[in-house]
């Protein structure tokens, strides 16, 4: 039996949430004035006339810190819902999260030993 009618609210939400941004872009594209000129083609830096080249090279250390930050930021995103429903999930979920955190700690120790977290 085809039970698509049970998901009517989901499909309505999906269609409306997809249509709103598309309509916003279309309306702004139709109603906005189009003025081309040298001011539109220049870069904007907080109201200050840009000086020098906009491209600079960052040291690889910044990327290593950013990667470690992203890993532990994602860990927080995964741990928060678990912590909110800890009393419902039971011991098996606790063991799974413990293994998850243990793997992340091993990754942190590995990065630390490789010197990825030292600023030199």
From Swiss-Prot:
Any GO CC annotation of this UniProt entry: chloroplast thylakoid membrane
GO BP term, example: photosynthesis, light reaction
The entry's keywords: Chloroplast, Membrane, NAD, NADP, Plastid, Plastoquinone, Quinone, Thylakoid, Translocase, Transmembrane, Transmembrane helix, Transport
Pfam families per the UniProt record, alphabetical: Oxidored_q4 (PF00507)
Class of the enzyme per the UniProt entry, highest EC level: translocase
Annotated membrane topology: Multi-pass membrane protein
Lineage top rank: taxon: Eukaryota
EC number(s) reported in the record: 7.1.1.-
Regions crossing the membrane: 9-29, 64-84, 88-108
Catalytic activity, as annotated: a plastoquinone + NADH + (n+1) H(+)(in) = a plastoquinol + NAD(+) + n H(+)(out); a plastoquinone + NADPH + (n+1) H(+)(in) = a plastoquinol + NADP(+) + n H(+)(out)
InterPro entries: NAD(P)H_OxRDtase_bac/plastid (IPR023043), NADH_UbQ/plastoQ_OxRdtase_su3 (IPR000440), NDAH_ubi_oxred_su3_sf (IPR038430)
GO molecular function, one term: NADH dehydrogenase (ubiquinone) activity
Compartments (UniProt record): Plastid, Chloroplast thylakoid membrane
Subunit: NDH is composed of at least 16 different subunits, 5 of which are encoded in the nucleus.
Record-linked PANTHER family: NADH-UBIQUINONE OXIDOREDUCTASE CHAIN 3
Similarity section: Belongs to the complex I subunit 3 family.
Stated role: NDH shuttles electrons from NAD(P)H:plastoquinone, via FMN and iron-sulfur (Fe-S) centers, to quinones in the photosynthetic chain and possibly in a chloroplast respiratory chain. The immediate electron acceptor for the enzyme in this species is believed to be plastoquinone. Couples the redox reaction to proton translocation, and thus conserves the redox energy in a proton gradient.
HAMAP family on file: NDH1_NuoA
UniProt protein name: NAD(P)H-quinone oxidoreductase subunit 3, chloroplastic
Organism: Arabis hirsuta
Gene: ndhC
């Amino acid at each position: 039996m085809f039970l698509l009618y049970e998901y009517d609210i989901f499909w309505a939400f999906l269609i409306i949430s997809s249509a709103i941004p598309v309509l916003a872009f279309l309306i702004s594209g139709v109603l906005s004035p189009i003025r081309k000129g040298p001011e539109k083609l220049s870069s904007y830096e907080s109201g200050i006339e840009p000086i020098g080249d906009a491209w600079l090279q960052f040291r690889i250390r910044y990327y290593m810190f950013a990667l470690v930050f992203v890993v532990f930021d994602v860990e927080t995103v995964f741990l928060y819902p678990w912590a909110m429903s800890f009393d419902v999930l039971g011991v098996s979920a606790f063991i799974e999260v413990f293994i998850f955190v243990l793997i992340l700690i091993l990754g942190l120790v590995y990065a630390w030993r490789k010197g990825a977290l030292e600023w030199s």
